[in-house]
Amino acid sequence: MTFDRRTVLAGLVLSTAVGLTPALAQSGAPKPYEVTPELIEAAKKEGTVTFYTATDVAVAERVGKAFEEKYPGIKVKVERSGSERVFQRISQEYGSNIHNADVIETSDAVHFLLFKRNGWLAQAVPAEVAKNWPADAKDADGYYAAYRAHLSVIGYNTQQVKAEDAPKSHADLLNPKWRGRIVKAHPGYSGTVMTGTDALSRALGWDYFEKLGKQRIMQVQSSTEPPKKLAQGERSIQADGNEYNMFMLKETGVPVEIVYATEGTPVAIGHAALLKNAPHPNAAKLFYSFIFDKDTQQLNSDVGGLRSYHPGVKEKETRTPLSKIKLLYSDPVKLEPEIETIKKKYEEYFGT
């Protein structure tokens, strides 16, 4: 198993959220569903499924293509944006009684507490999730489950920085020699970075970010962007960014390297859910099952560098196993009331 129970955050025990949402108290998850010929036929009649996602577009589109190859006649429409933008979009649409999306996925666990509370999600448990996902990687009432996990890592361009000179910790990023050479993603756009900012502020204190903000940071939006800035040579160091993008670049020969900071590396969990008012309910149900099956989870790992909860997924030997990485976690229940404070402090320290 690539993401074992020992590495799952106790604070991400999603059943905790049930206590916060008494209006949605349930007797438990519904009976798991299998993919049947009848479901496939009904999905083909609908002909399309719309997937709102925060996963890197290249990875999400590969998943969509794999689905189309397995189920000819059903088109996957991938709508990719940063987690916070996905959240804003679905909130605006549902607030206006507009229902375009069938399946939704973001890397901010808080979103799914809110989606569930608002009654926007359908109870649906694919058989694969029921069989293989640990209890703390799925909602106790069957509204959502962990589609992926990834880390927000420090990294560097190996043509611009020697290994012996590279930062080994978050504190090392405060060294004056890195001033003007660092790129960083934004918590107001990226769920990964919102989660990471929460974890790091609790571990290191806000004074760390205050000092980092004085390093003349190149500010970008998505956590997919810093690795690409390193690859293009626009900056030498990334303060944060998706581990999976770094895997993808490094494994194609791009001169980048990952650093797992001595203080710890933040973990982000990307949940997925079936929307209650999905315009293509059968195609949505089929696609929702598909994204959790072994082959899709293996595709996410092989092509996208994502960590999986599926016990059958095998990671590439060149990748550092989670058991050898010190991890930092964010509790979505504690993060939820702090989101606006985090955005305000970040703007104060980074000017954006």
PLM feature spans:
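N-terminal secretory signal peptides and thylakoid transit peptides that target proteins
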Residues: 1-13
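Periplasmic-binding protein-like
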Residues: 23, 149-150, 178-188, 210-213, 219-220, 252-276, 290-314, ...
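Extracytoplasmic ligand-binding site segments that recognize negatively charged/polar headgroups
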Residues: 50-64, 76-91, 99-227, 231-234
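A ligand-binding cleft/hinge motif common to bilobed small-molecule-binding domains
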Residues: 110-114, 236-255
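Short beta-strand->loop
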Residues: 121-130, 142-145, 171, 248-266, ...
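A bilobed periplasmic-binding-protein/Venus flytrap-type ligand-binding module shared by bacterial periplasmic
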Residues: 155-160, 198, 268-280, 291, ...
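C-terminal capping/gating helix-and-loop segments adjacent to ligand/active sites or protein-protein/ligand interfaces
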Residues: 296-352
